[in-house]
Every structure is written in C-alpha cells, then in structure tokens.
Amino acid sequence: MSVSDKDFKDIELLPVKSIESKDSIDQCDPLTWPIRIRIINTIIISFMTMLCMYGSSVFMPSIPELCEKFGEPETLVVLGATLYVIGVMLGPLIFSPLSELYGRRPLNIFGYTLFALMQIPTALSVNLAMFVVFRFFSGFFGSVGLGIGAGSLSDMFSKRDRGKYIGIYFLGICLGPAIAPIASGFIAGSSISWRWEFWILLMLSGVSLLAGVVFLKETYAPVLKRKQAKKLLEKQENQKSVEVKISEITESSQQIDPDKSFAEVVHILVTTIRRPLHLLCTQPIMILISLIVGTVYGILYLLFTAFAEVWISQYHFTSGLSGLTYISLSIGQVFAVFVLLPLNQKYWLSAVQKNNGVPEPEFRLPMAFLGCFAIMTGMFIFGWTVQYKVFWFVPLIGTTLVGAGFVMTFNPMNMFIVDNYGRYAASAMAAIAIPRNIFGACFPLFAEKLFERLGYGWGSSLLAFLLVAINFSIAALYMFGKTIREKRPFDHTKY
C-alpha cells in the first residue's frame, strides 16, 4: 500500500515534550527543505548519472585499438558497449523498487561505490572476456542514479517547479554519452593507452562519490517519517501508544522492520521488485511511452556508434578531431535544456491555468512532438550531406538538431511518468529503462551494416521515417492519454 501524509497525522497529536517542533516535522518533507539543499542534491545526483552515461560511450573512439589489443573483430568489441547498456537496463529493476523500501541515499552510495570500483578491473583487462564482464557490472551498478534520480527529484520538487530541475538531471543523462568521446578521442589519437579512459572515469566517479557521502541527503518521505517515528519511540514517555503508531506506519509503508519474519521480508522485497515489470506489462501508457523513448534512445546510440567512422572515412578527420564533432550534440542538448524546456514549462503553466488549476501529465507532451520532428530533420540533414561529402559544418547542423530533439522528446516523456506515478516514479522509470536500454543496446549492432548497404543518406532516412510513426504515437498519447489512464489506473495496493 502507498503511504500518505494522513498515515502520520496522529503522531503530531501525541504528547510531545522535546522533539515535536515545526523544524523537525519539516525535515520529513523534502518539499519544504531550503532550496540550497535541494539544488545541491540535484547537482550531485545529476553528475553521478552523467558519469554513468559517460561510461556507456567512453571507449568508442578506441575500438580499433581494442580490436588490435584483444585480437577480436569490431562486432565483438562493441559488446563492451552493448553489455554495459544491458547492465544499465537491469540495475534500475533492483535499485528503484528497493529505494522505495530502504530510501534513496543508501542505495545511491552503495551502487555508486561499486560503479567506481568496477573501473579498476576494466582498465586492467587482459582479454575481451574480462573487459565485457566488468563493463556489464559497471553499467549495472552505475545505473543506480538512472533508477533513483527522477524519483529523488520528484521527492524534492512540486509539479510546478519540477520541470526545470529534472531538466538539469536529464541534461546529465544526455550529455554523458555525448562528451565522453570528446576526451576519449584525443586519448585514442595519442600515444596514451586506452586504459586511461577508465582511469579518468575512476577519478571522476571518486570525486562525485565523495560529494555524495558528504552532502547527499535522504529524500524519500516514508523513510524520513519512519526515522522521525523511531525518534518519538525513543523519547516519548507513552511508549505503548507510540508503538501502536510505529506498527501502523511500518505496515502501511511496507518498510522493512526488524520484527518482521524472514518470509515477510522476502515477500515485501519480491513484491516491490516485481512492481516495474507489473507496470510495464499491464499499463498501456507505459507500453506506448516505452516504444517512443526506446526508439529515440536507440537512434541516438546508433549515431554514437557511427560517428567516429563517418568523420574518419568521409572527411579524413583524426581520432581527436572526430571526437570533437560530438560537441554538436552537446550544444543542441544544452540549448534545449536552458532555452526550449523553459518554454515548455511556460506552456505547462498556461495549460494548467486554463484547466482550472488541475495539472494533467499530457500537458508535458507538445514539446516531445516538436522534439521528434527535430530529430527527423537532423537525421535527413546529417545523412545526405555526409553521403555527398558536403562541407563538414553542414552535417554538424543536423547533429545539433538531433541533440536538441533528443532532450525535447526524452524530458517530457519522463516528466509525464513522474507526474503520473508520483511516489512510485522510481519504479515506473525502472520499467521504462527495460525497453529503452534494449533498443540502446541493439541499434548500434546493425549500424555498420545499415550504412554499408543503404549508404549514409538512405540509412539515415530510414531512421527518420521510423520517427514519423513515433510522432503519431506521441500525438495519440496527447489526445487519448487521459482516457487510457482513467480506464487502466495503476493499482498500487497490490504492489
């Protein structure tokens, strides 16, 4: 069952002598925290998540060197990226629901510690098998930010303010895979070993982990309220009365309690971990959003895989210069976050006002429609200008549009999920991560064959035509989403 504020209202009515003050109650509600604390939490979570996504494409420019080092073909070396993305897909299935039992902070610190440690054996890999195995575990543990991040931000910000701060978080998701090849491209084109790509990632993740240990706070209200209730139990004179309230809180929030039997604990854990799969398999809204987000994500990763080869073969760039071309994607993403998403927030506020102050998740979606169109346009420009070797600056205009369009599509879709599923946003985000990362893992596998057989022009056009169907899906979600949600609501009492 879900936990509402009314589950705790009786606690405030108990005779309190020493700890019931307005300040102590506010500590249980992250929405009331000082904005400085919430922004610090947002920055740390966003940076951790960015580094996880940074890791997904960090070795792309060094693929030729790895092929030579391990004596394996490119199709097998690319498994280092594929298995990483699969790890990123599976991690949120565990971390997200567990964060709704144990809280966000301990899982963030645990997962990110292991993510940092996984860079050591990856950098020391002596063969391809060792490399891809530790790449998988690196993605699995690093995905904790992807699974919990959106939920943490929804804990701290109201629907009115949520858009701009979650926009910063999603900027980290988008920038990570785009900026990694920039640094790695120069490493690949120099005498420095490819291993330094992972040593640098270890250093960066160590810094962010230290910041998390020092500054990151717990944001999940049921966990905070449970801790507050335990303080009451310790300090109140009327022990029996308070114990009753503690029991009610534990039962209603499904928190793991030391007094529960092992079988009860296992039941709660299994039920909670099943929640993302239940959402994905039974919610039509989730299925539709999964297809939309997965397709866009897959196209972006396909582009990451093809980028280095395009600039080297068609324009004879060095590895370092080809890495710099990823900046165009980053420029588009930054522009979308700081210019276009605020416009979408203004539209959302206007739509809420016209709807008598009632916010609907569908109000987030118009920007996604425009974003998908921007990706389509960018793919056409990129593909055909590269095909005919037009001046290199022109295809970069196309990739800038792709970068902006990705944020414009990805952010509203995830905001829709956060708005619709509220306290269970972390589980819903974990559900979306499954198809999203399957697409992200599979699309790069056929990138080489796609452009080899169709050429860059028609290959990119095929992907753009696929996005036409995606745009129709976004339009359908906007028009009929509310009806679908009302007919098939999520019954959180079962999960």
Swiss-Prot record:
UniProt topology in membrane: Multi-pass membrane protein
One Pfam entry name: MFS_1
Domain of life, per lineage: Eukaryota
Ranges annotated as spanning the membrane: 43-63, 75-95, 106-126, 128-148, 168-188, 196-216, 284-304, 323-343, 366-386, 390-410, 426-446, 461-481
Disruption phenotype: Lead to sensitivity to camptothecin and DNA damaging agents.
Keywords: Membrane, Transmembrane, Transmembrane helix, Transport
Major location (coarse): membrane
This protein's record includes keyword Membrane: yes
Keyword Transmembrane part of the UniProt annotation: yes
Gene Ontology MF term list: copper ion transmembrane transporter activity; transmembrane transporter activity
GO cellular component: cytoplasm; prospore membrane
InterPro entries in UniProt: MFS, MFS_dom, MFS_trans_sf
GO terms of biological process kind: copper ion import across prospore membrane; transmembrane transport
Subcellular compartments: Membrane
Family statement drawn from the similarity comment of this UniProt entry: Belongs to the major facilitator superfamily. CAR1 family.
Name of the protein this chain belongs to: Uncharacterized transporter mfc1
Source species: Schizosaccharomyces pombe (strain 972 / ATCC 24843) (Fission yeast)
